[in-house]
Amino acid sequence: MASLGGDNSQAEGAEVRHVPVLIAEVIDALKPAPGAVIVDGTFGAGGYTRRILETGADVIAIDRDPTAIEAGRAMEKEFPGRLNLVESRFSALDEAVARMSGAGKKVDGVVLDIGVSSMQIDEAERGFSFQKDGPLDMRMSSRGSSAADAVNRLKTGDLARIFNFLGEERHAGRIARMIEKRRAAKPFTRTLDLANAIETLVGRNPKDRIHPATRVFQALRVYVNDELGELARALLAAERILKPGGRLVVVTFHSLEDRMVKRFFADRAGGSAGSRHMPETHMRLPSFTPAVKGAVGPTPEEEERNPRARSAKLRAGIRTENSPLEDDLSLFGLPKLPETNELARS
């Protein structure tokens, strides 16, 4: 269930080709056209952005990873005046649009690919992979607390909650207690050190397709980068900046994120009941209508060609003329976890 999505890279001689997941389905749902302005909130290796630019639309591409932005400069030159790269969190995509196009500017589409780029997974020094030895980092950018900070400084109960909720790890408590005992003697600093310790503790069933550390590494990455909070705020920001008729397309790679997107579109289409924050007596006009039926997955051919696409799901909505609804983060049911910015000071 690891969230290993995004652009898939393959070496072809000296050149690297990037194969984005569900690209045909994304373009079909997004419907970019010449002269349209599309926000790619998760630029990564630029796979979606390139295909959108090839339709004649202009792109504002956002990524919090400065390495991705720097790698995209060549594409910026290839499409002069039509691609604007912005180093930013995608939760602030409305601010990025205002910076590039002016306050109050609306756009024709937003696409979000909620997964880790294979470029990040494949770079051992980024610390995302339990299959390659590297520093226990996992940050999308160089700012903020690292996975090592979380593993070595969080309370055992907090670690267990993170592993359980963000990784759906059934051995969460046992792993958290093992970490507490081990770090007292020697802090965890390397990816393989943590991965091997987890494998030694819980064992490895030959029938299991995934490594025993998969869910813990996923949980730490999601926690360190506040990925669920980022997604929630990005969905609300997209609602604010889309024109009537504009399209929001979101690709997710595991169930936590997909449930959030599904809940958002259901709520914005008027499919949810009232809550204590928004009573049923309050008339709410829908801000989105469905652009696709349910969730769209990869074809068998794409799964065969790109195994990382197997867990991908696409959901999409079309912005109505009604005003954005309330920015209510409680809609997403996010857990209360320790703030990552407190770790470096603890």
From Swiss-Prot:
Query: Does the record carry Cell inner membrane as a key word?
Result: no
The GO annotation for biological process reads: rRNA base methylation
Q: What is its EC number?
A: 2.1.1.199
Task: Give the region (Disordered) as residue ranges.
Answer: 270-327
Q: Which GO cellular component terms, listed alphabetically, does the Swiss-Prot or TrEMBL entry include?
A: cytoplasm
The subcellular localization recorded is: Cytoplasm
| Primary location class | cytoplasm
Indicate whether Methyltransferase appears among the record's keywords. Answer: yes
Q: Which Pfam families match?
A: Methyltransf_5
**Binding positions for S-adenosyl-L-methionine per the UniProt entry:** G46, G47, Y48, D63, F90, D113, Q120
UniProt keyword annotations, A-Z: Cytoplasm, Methyltransferase, rRNA processing, S-adenosyl-L-methionine, Transferase
By its UniProt entry, which InterPro entries does this protein fall under?
Answer: RsmH (IPR002903), SAM-dep_MeTrfase_MraW_recog (IPR023397), SAM-dependent_MTases_sf (IPR029063)
Gene Ontology molecular function terms on file: rRNA (cytosine-N4-)-methyltransferase activity
Catalytic function, reaction form? cytidine(1402) in 16S rRNA + S-adenosyl-L-methionine = N(4)-methylcytidine(1402) in 16S rRNA + S-adenosyl-L-homocysteine + H(+)
Q: Which family does it belong to?
A: Belongs to the methyltransferase superfamily. RsmH family.
Question: What function does the entry list?
Answer: Specifically methylates the N4 position of cytidine in position 1402 (C1402) of 16S rRNA.
Q: What is this protein called?
A: Ribosomal RNA small subunit methyltransferase H
Q: Which gene encodes it?
A: rsmH
